[in-house]
């Protein structure tokens, strides 16, 4: 409930106004940022992971100190990766010595991450898509350049932070899981989501998609295509809403949910067809290009604050002025 309040501007503003009233402050000055809680999204995921496993009879073998350290582990607090409690505790208990090898490994990861985030991402942010340049740009070519810049900016920013988190964790004796694996080089959307924010996708697969599809098998909605559609669209909608309770994040989640379902149906159709096998290399190259552009178009909803502006940008990309 607290996560929903913090992610919803209207609810956060109402809660802030209520608390201001209790403290004899002016409720009219309430803002959603009053209740910002640094890293709470990832704290919530860790808590839900432990509670869900406990509900399923899988109690994490951790003492209180290990549990608190896991929940608020600083390097991965802001943007992940989302570690598993048992794996984290195993690293925490293992003998650890800070030696030259560890320093070299961690230092390399920190430097690479800093370069991605503070050099590449910051440079790309100067021309990446935003509300201001989206409203001003009329040329389809320039609009595509803005979208491409945003796609690579968000990757280098997020992957750079992850590299630094993994490097910092290594210095403390914790081997955080990898979170990115060349996502823009994947030939389909399913492989993209197995390579982008890997631990988030694994979390939703384990605690939402898999339980939901198991439940659907016992209902009337037990046809495979329908189960896949409901599972994928609901999972991606939840991931979108987790980023923020806005229409744009709903649209972004729906965009990816529909894309995943289309790929699932295509993969099922193409499986075992010898007539398509001889074009495997062409399909792979074409798939990389198509998948990247599908993801890049989806970033339009992610980058902009207004749904109508996002639709206008998508139209302008294809030479339609609305």
Locate predicted features.
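Membrane-embedded transmembrane alpha-helical bundles that form the catalytic cores
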Residues: 1-322
